[in-house]
Each structure stands twice: as structure tokens, then as C-alpha cells.
Amino acid sequence: MSSDLEIARAAKLRPIATVADEAKIPAEALHSYGLHVAKIDTSLLPKKDRPAKLVLVTAINPTPAGEGKTTTTIGLGDALRRLGKACVIALREPSLGPCFGTKGGATGGGYAQIVPMERINLHLTGDFHAITSAHNLLAALIDNHLYWGAEPKIDSRKVAWRRVLDMNDRALRQIVVGLGGGGNGYPRETGFDITAASEIMAIFCLSKDLADLQQRLAQIIVAQDVNKQPVRADALQAVGAMTVLLKDALMPNLVQTLEGTPTFVHGGPFANIAHGCNSVAATLAAMQLGDYVVTEAGFGADLGAEKFLDIKCRQAGIAPSAAVIVATARALKSHGGVAPADLNKENLDALKAGLANLGRHIANVKKFGLPVVVAINHFLSDTEAEQELIAHTCRDEYGVEAIDCRHWAAGGKGALALAEKVIALVEGGTAQFKMLYEDTLPLIEKMRRIAQEIYGAADISLDAKAKKQLADIEAQGFGHFPVCVAKTQYSFAADPKLLGAPTGHIVPIREVRLSAGAGFVVMICGDIMTMPGLSRQPAAWKIGLDAQGNIEGLF
């Protein structure tokens, strides 16, 4: 079979104006970026009395074998359109870090892709650049404020705002700025995070409109002053310029699938170190256009789905009508202890052991009151016995249906059975959405509930630094915020080596960060880093141009 890149290049894309017109997007709302990409002015969209039904796609804990969550999201959207439903897909934008690192892009695969694939994976309309620029403008204004000794007097030892870059670069995790003499400012320790972990990214993705964005930017707490009082971005007169940088970027990007399904690609926070959901602006816009909106949350349901349901839905006032959990026989065998080299071999004992991971994710999503269906993303190495074991276990032990899906090879046609089941779940009206915790629960108890109810942990632990940070945040009046957990994506535990469905473990919290503008508190667990590093053999080694100027090695 052709590679993803070859399939994407062979596709006959429709003009984005045609895609927009079929989605009932007014021509005056369309800001074209070439023939196949546009931004949408959401203020000009028609308002529906009954917004579309929202379907959340999530997955088991990821493995090197891959699950195909984005591919399934796209295949499901195409299948719903084949069944006559007006469907819009809402996805996150890819980050350059994973594209040049290990994970790769985020445009799906096979015949379930969004296009133009190369452009989406590399810059798209420049939103990440705008977010990076706005974030680093605030950082520059902080150091300029320190240099001139302006009021309020910032304590240079208490600056919390780091810089960001949309790249995996471990050398920038801890740095010293202001070296080289008094003309270069005050030396102090700081560091870089990846743009996807930026609070500006979170604010960007949680803002409903420009007014909401500007209000959130003003609330960012960047430091303490010499009297131990919080210093906000508005005190540095930063908000107006930051908003200007983000104004056009806040308009959602419209692209299409290989089958022409309209797709919003907007915002890109990671789910392991941020909240892992596409923008509220894009999701709300999609819900005004279609009968169904299919969206995804990053990594496994323990991270992305929990944050989608406890953070995004809480702040945006939305609720899904059903959830799809993606798994593969290969990934389940990996959770059952099979080495990567042996994943193509049938191993029913390992598969049975690995199914415990899927079972916990199913139980967790049900705790939010959502009906669930499992999508088994089919691989050529899957055997009939493996498919039967998955189906029987899901039905008999977990009380859900598992559907064999072949959208990678067949596009929307390969996900028709999944789409029919999703329609049945949605139209059955059984969803009774509820969040895992109330706003009034103390922050430490919110974290404990997530750890025990979602991760299967015995308890949590906080070191002295984290305890003080948590106490300070509570004292400042932010105890009502939801919790955003930064944790390894590979396990329910903070240890990435604990596969399957571990129980009885302790979740160690080493740092607590306040994101006052985004409206949540970040709990950093274990060894997770907010600036990733490149792998021993980064994907960047294989990427280049051929003699005709075409990109090679992207996927």
C-alpha cells in the first residue's frame, strides 16, 4: 500500500470555498489561505437552536505500536457523512516538536487523513508562531520591567513565567538569562517549555472569543512582587499587544478529509503536559454547523478525556453524547507484556492480560455518564481469534460493543459499522454527563479523586515544595479551579513502565503551577517534562526535499 504522504499527494482536493459552502459557512466568514485552507470568522456563522451532537474519541494508554485515534476520528467523521449525517470534525494542530521527534504528525493515516497533509503538519496558518510570539513577548516585558526597576517591583527570584519554543530541545529546560554585564539585564534562572505546554496555548484553546481571550490574558500571574503579592500580565501593560498577536490566529482553521468532510484544525496543547483538547472556539463553531461533531482528546482517556470532560466541558458549557475508545490488538498485546518485535504474532494470553487496560478506560469513561463503544483499529496482522477475544471480553465483561474498523485501508466505508453504533448511542439519549468532581472540592482532594478513581492509585504524595505551592494557590483564592495533571501518557501510574491496569500505586506530585488565565492548576507528577527532548534517532534525519522540491520522509 502507498505511504500516507503518497496517498495525501494523490488526493484530488476540493476548493476550500466549496467545502465551506457545503458546511453552510457564509462566504463573508471565509478568510482563504490559498486554495485548500481557510480561517473562519466565527462571529459571522449562523446560530442554531439545537447545536450538533458531540462525540468524543479517546483511546487506551498509547504504546509504540500505535492506536490510530486521529485516524479513527477522521474515519468516523467520513462514515457519518456517508450515512447522511452533516458531520464536522474538530482536531488539534500538530506541533513541530513531535513531527521532527518521534511521534510524527497528527493528520491521520492511510485513507483516513486530513489534507493538505504537509501544510497542516508544518506551520499551517502560523497559529503556533503567533502563540509562541505572544508568550515570549510577555517574557521580554517581564525582563524589561526588571531592568528598568518599574512598579510594581518584581522579585526576580519569584518570576514564574518561562519562555517557549515549538521544538523538542532538552538543552533549554534550565537556563540562565541576563549574562554578560549590566546592560543585558539581571541574571536569573529560568527555562523553556514547548509551546504546546504554554499557558497562552491553554488560554487560546479555552477562549470563546476575543473578549474572553483578552480577559484571560489579563489574569495571567507571572511573578510575585517584593511584598509577595501576585503580579499579573495587565500590570505590565502586556495584554493589548498580546491580543493583537493572537487576533487572527483565534479564528479556527478549516481543511478537509480525503473524502471532503469539513474539519476544523485549531490549537494544539499536549494531553500529557497540558489539557490536550482543540480550541473551544472551533468546537463551538462546529456545533453550529453540523448534526454531529466528532472530536478527540490527546493520548489515553486517563489524560485527554478526563481533561476534556473536567476542564474543557466545564469551562465551555458543552457535553458529549457518546464516547469512542480506540484500541488495537497490537497495542493491547503490548500492554500484556509482548515485545515490539513480536506484536504481529498471535498471543491470546498476552492479549487477555492487556485487555485490562481497555477495561479500566471503559469503566472510567462510564463514570462520566457517557455511553461507550470500542473501535478496534484493524491491522493486517490481526487474527480472527484475537478479534473474537476482544469482542467477547468487551461484551461479556465490560458491557460494551467492540467494532472492527478498517478506515485506514478503506476510508469512511471501513467505519460504517462504528458510525451506525455511534448514531444508535447518540439517538438513544442515554448520556447523563457528569464531571468527576465539584468546583468546591479542595485542590488536593480533586487530585486525589483523579488518582484513585481514574488511575487506580492508592493515594497521592506531595513533596515539601509542592505542598507550599499548593497552599499558596489556595490562599490566593484559586481553590475552585479544576486540576490539570501532567503525567506520563504510557501508564495509569506516574511510572511509564507500569503497563496494563496497575493498582495500589502512589502518584507523586513534585510541582504545582497556577494557570490563572487558563483557569486551572497544573499538578506535575513523576519525571514528566514540559520541554521534551529529541530521540536518539529523530525523525528530522529522514526529512528533506527531492530534486523537484517535494518534501520527503515526513511520513
UniProtKB/Swiss-Prot annotation:
Its EC number is 6.3.4.3. CDD domains: FTHFS. The keyword ATP-binding applies. GO terms for biological process: tetrahydrofolate interconversion. It catalyses: (6S)-5,6,7,8-tetrahydrofolate + formate + ATP = (6R)-10-formyltetrahydrofolate + ADP + phosphate. It is an enzyme of class 6 (ligase). Pathway: One-carbon metabolism; tetrahydrofolate interconversion. ATP binds at residues 63-70. Keywords: ATP-binding, Ligase, Nucleotide-binding, One-carbon metabolism. InterPro entries: Formate_THF_ligase, Formate_THF_ligase_CS, P-loop_NTPase. One of its GO terms (molecular function) is formate-tetrahydrofolate ligase activity. Belongs to the formate--tetrahydrofolate ligase family. This is Formate--tetrahydrofolate ligase. It comes from Beijerinckia indica subsp. indica (strain ATCC 9039 / DSM 1715 / NCIMB 8712). The lineage of its organism: Bacteria, Pseudomonadati, Pseudomonadota, Alphaproteobacteria, Hyphomicrobiales.
